[in-house]
Curated annotation (Swiss-Prot):
Residues excised as propeptide: 22-62
Protein name as annotated: Cell wall protein PIR5
InterPro entries associated with the record: PIR1-like_C (IPR054508), Yeast_CWMannoprotein_PIR (IPR051153), Yeast_PIR_rpt (IPR000420)
Described purpose of this protein according to its UniProt entry: Component of the outer cell wall layer. May be involved in meiosis and sporulation.
A GO-annotated cellular component: fungal-type cell wall
Length: 287
């Protein structure tokens, strides 16, 4: 009888341990501090636009982030708003393209998840941007170049020349109409192929390929996994501030650092080719 009771106790303990699902180990990779009033849940897909510190609110330059395939996030070297793009590996990039003020470029993503912004030159047209929290609007020559994502997830904005087909088909970049906490995203931008599209779930950023937004060992912002890249510093603790900017912990200042024909994004300056920026969250619409 004694052995039978011991066996049953062991069996029940084993079942209890099996039922327990601990959180992902990388979910604990978060900053020690949080953004006051930050939103950690936003399940509707949104993009990011790079806003340099040199512009005023009345002439907002939004570089929409792109993402290359490996998940890296990149921004072009273009002197205007760029939607962040993402290349295939998850990197985020922004291009170095030069154009008149008041333009919106979405961050793109390349295939590996990197985010990039390119330096491409775009054809521009007259358009009006409604400035958030202001009654007046600023009219100027402007376009919206979406930041793309390559296959590794890098986010980029390229420096290749763009045609007039990339120009905004709508004349206004307007505040989005969202209920409750979704009002935190106040503007919209055109979505195109490669544009970084993400959601925020419990302080974790997830791109359209299911990869996790993280600050990796070299301080670069990109998307990998899951799990995130080995040696990642942060994989959680993301939020949207009450001003609509992306934050990691209590910090909403990022750096676009020149890398050839595009910028990569970092949470710290890594040298002389870096400039401080805000990453403005934008609602993505088909134009």
């Amino acid at each position: 009888m004694h052995y039978k009771k011991a066996f049953l106790a062991s069996l029940l303990s084993s079942i209890a341990l099996t039922a327990y699902a601990p959180p992902e180990p990388w979910a604990t990779l978060t900053p020690s501090s949080k953004m006051d009033g930050g939103t950690t849940e936003y399940r509707t897909s949104f993009g990011l636009a790079v806003i340099p510190f040199t512009v005023t609110e009345s002439k907002v330059k939004r570089n929409v982030i792109s993402q290359i395939n490996d998940g890296q996030v990149q921004v072009t070297t273009q002197k205007l708003p760029h939607p962040v793009s993402q290349i295939g590996d998850g990197q985020i990039q922004v291009t170095t393209q030069k154009v008149p003020p008041v333009v919106s470029h979405i961050v793109s993503q390349i295939g590996d998840g990197q985010l990039q912004i390119t330096t491409a030159k775009n054809v521009v047209t007259k358009s009006t941007i409604a400035v958030p929290s202001k009654t007046a609007t600023a009219t100027a020559t402007s376009t919206a170049t979406a930041v793309s994502q390559i296959h590794d997830g890098q986010v980029q904005v390229t420096i290749s020349s763009a045609s007039s087909s990339s120009v905004l088909s709508k004349s206004k970049l307007e505040p989005t109409k969202k209920p409750n906490n979704e009002n935190v995203i106040k503007v919209q931008a055109c979505k195109s192929s490669g544009t970084l599209a993400i959601t925020l779930q419990g302080g974790v950023l997830i791109d359209s390929n299911g990869r996790i937004g993280s600050i990796v060992a070299n301080r670069q912002f990109q998307f990998d996994g899951p799990p995130p890249q080995a040696g990642a510093i942060y994989a959680g603790g993301w939020s949207i501030t009450k001003h609509g900017t992306l934050a990691i912990g209590d910090n909403d200042v990022f750096y676009q650092c020149l890398s050839g024909t595009f910028y990569n994004l970092y949470d710290q300056s890594i040298g002389g080719q870096c400039n401080p920026v805000h990453l403005q969250t934008v609602g993505l619409v088909d134009c």
